[in-house]
Amino acid sequence: MPEADSSVLQIWGGHPLRGHVKISGAKNSALVIMAGALLCSGDCRIRNVPLLADVERMGEVISALGVRLTRQADIIDINASEIKTSKAPYELVTQLRASFFAIGAILARLGVAQMPLPGGCAIGARPVDLHVRGLQAMGAEVQIEHGICNAYVPGSGGRLKGAKIYLDTPSVGATETLMMAATLADGETILENAAREPEVVDLANFCKAMGANIQGAGTSTITIVGVPKLHSVDYSIIPDRIEAGTFLVAGAITRSEITLSSVVPDHLIPLIAKLRDIGVTIIEESPDCLRILPAEILKATDIDTLPHPGFPTDMQAPFMALLTLAEGDSIINESVFENRLRHASELNRLGADIRVKGNTAFVRGVPILSGAPVIGTDLRASAALVIAGLAAEGKTTIQGLHHLDRGYDQIDVKLQQLGAKILRVREEPANAEVAANNNASPAPIST
């Protein structure tokens, strides 16, 4: 894993991309499926796991519970036959929001769990009240004190009980947490207004492969009938739809022809529809392969982010970068998370014309972007800056790579292989702006 705290990305824009890129496994599947492996007392082999800082950190959380975990290439093996402690480490969980979701699996296995409140990207309030109320409905006693969530199941058996749970919002994390908890509960659990994201379906399929009884994943009503025990599994996670979308947008903004493999087109329907709206041609070459063709003119469009199957909030920032060069005025309404438009000011540093009011961004297309030093403020914002840098004239230097490395598997290497002039350079932060003002062309990049 690159040491992003002392590195910057330098991008010399204006070069078309060409070639093929293989999409890695889904970050948001990998994290929750690793947590789901705690439900099983046998061996779990998880394939197609991306190389990410978040995955590495999740592995550290699981190992800290006393669980055996090994990794080789894109395969992770987990044996949770013995979970030695129910207390997750504060310093790790507070850095990774998804690690909190393991509370459902730990509570289901042990009848007790102690989990610090989560961390991750600072993109607005993402409370855990839905998780807590759902676990309480299943019979758990839950208290939050001093930033620690303490949960236990009263009684000698320590087994959660099935319940009918309505989620006020279709929270992905709450749906996944409660689905995991319900797999080993006594009786039937029904989750109403459940999240429908592909990663929720992937977790359900993983649990079903271990012997769980889950019906309705991918719809707003999920029914889980608890079983006494789950068995070993060998499972491959789905491709990352957000990484795929990011490369499609990178191809669109650079007017390039590239091919993406290891994709699920059905997971990209809203994004592909918007790309076609603005004039981009997307061809489904095969059931797991897409090709993007360059558009002569990019047209403005409006976007409202929504829970799946709507336009994904994780693609809002990358698509905003694309719309900075579209002809006309676009409106982007971020309705899923608050405080998720901070990348607009950084895009404006590159010459974009974006005005933000509340959770809405008004984007007026400009003829060109110009390279400048910028800082990624969160994971998807960093991706947006990479995309803009690929199209900008001159040199763009991006700081804050620890965000990017949380969610993209070697994105700079993959872009190099497509012909982008992009380099990861280790340097002290104080020198980054000085380096950014040096507009010399890079040495040829070996691919």
Swiss-Prot record:
Q: Where in the cell is it found?
A: Cytoplasm
Q: Which residues bind phosphoenolpyruvate?
A: 27-28
Q: Which residues bind UDP-N-acetyl-alpha-D-glucosamine?
A: 97, 126-130, 314, 336
Q: Which InterPro entries match?
A: Enolpyruvate_Tfrase_dom (IPR001986), Enolpyruvate_Tfrase_sf (IPR036968), MurA_subfamily (IPR050068), RNA3'P_cycl/enolpyr_Trfase_a/b (IPR013792), UDP_GlcNAc_COvinyl_MurA (IPR005750)
List, from the UniProt record, the residues annotated as the active site of this protein. Answer: 121
For this UniProt record, give its keywords in alphabetical order, as a comma-separated list. Cell cycle, Cell division, Cell shape, Cell wall biogenesis/degradation, Cytoplasm, Peptidoglycan synthesis, Pyruvate, Transferase
Q: What is its main location?
A: cytoplasm
Give the modified residues of type 2-(S-cysteinyl)pyruvic acid O-phosphothioketal: 121
Quote the cellular component terms of the Gene Ontology held in the record.
cytoplasm
Say which domain of life the source belongs to.
Answer: Bacteria
Q: Name one Pfam family in it.
A: EPSP_synthase
Which catalytic reaction applies to this protein? Answer: phosphoenolpyruvate + UDP-N-acetyl-alpha-D-glucosamine = UDP-N-acetyl-3-O-(1-carboxyvinyl)-alpha-D-glucosamine + phosphate
Pathway per the UniProt entry: Cell wall biogenesis; peptidoglycan biosynthesis
State the Gene Ontology BP annotations. cell division; cell wall organization; peptidoglycan biosynthetic process; regulation of cell shape; UDP-N-acetylgalactosamine biosynthetic process
Q: Which Gene3D superfamilies match?
A: Enolpyruvate transferase domain (3.65.10.10)
**Recorded E.C. number(s)?**
2.5.1.7
Alphabetically, the GO molecular function entries are: UDP-N-acetylglucosamine 1-carboxyvinyltransferase activity
Record-stated family: Belongs to the EPSP synthase family. MurA subfamily.
Xref: NCBIfam families: murA, PRK09369.1
Task of the protein: Cell wall formation. Adds enolpyruvyl to UDP-N-acetylglucosamine.
Record's protein name:
UDP-N-acetylglucosamine 1-carboxyvinyltransferase
| Organism expressing this protein natively | Trichormus variabilis (strain ATCC 29413 / PCC 7937)
Lineage per the UniProt record: Bacteria, Bacillati, Cyanobacteriota, Cyanophyceae, Nostocales
